[in-house]
Amino acid sequence: MEKEIVFVLLDEFADWEAAFLAPALCSGVMPGRPGSYAAKYMSPDGESVRSIGGLRATPDYDASTLPESCAGLILVGGMQWESAAARQIAPLAGEALKRGILVGAICNAVSFMAANGLLNGVRHTGNTVEMLKQWGGANYTGEALYEERQAVRDGNVVTANGTGYLEFTRECLLA
């Protein structure tokens, strides 16, 4: 069974935040060294979503279950991480963390992780610590583990701020 990296896309996703990682996983980063993964896409209901830039994506999966073949879950940032649709993703992110597979989050998806208490035991970054506290409320107790950097990797968890998409790609590839 081919290993898959599942990219979670919500309406108004930030298409550039996955633009470097997906091809590196699939095609590799060095000539003659092919990638080791298949990039798959998920939306909460399995229906097509549109990016901030107007790119329409048709997902492979809905959020009802995390595929057994999933070797990583990437939460792509965007404008809808506070929506009801986004709430369907929290159990999958928690399951991925329990399985010990890569969980990557960038931009507002990091704030979503804070809001669901998923960053409290790992070093992380985000758009700002103030934003993580605002979104997370009582669920976010990881302020002492926050680092003011473009991207942070702590074990199988990778986080990045909204301008750290290249660093996010690098840290996900190293995780």
Name each model feature, range by range.
Residues 47-49:
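Mixed-charge, low-complexity segments
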Residues 52-60:
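Short gly/ser/thr-rich secondary-structure transition/capping motifs
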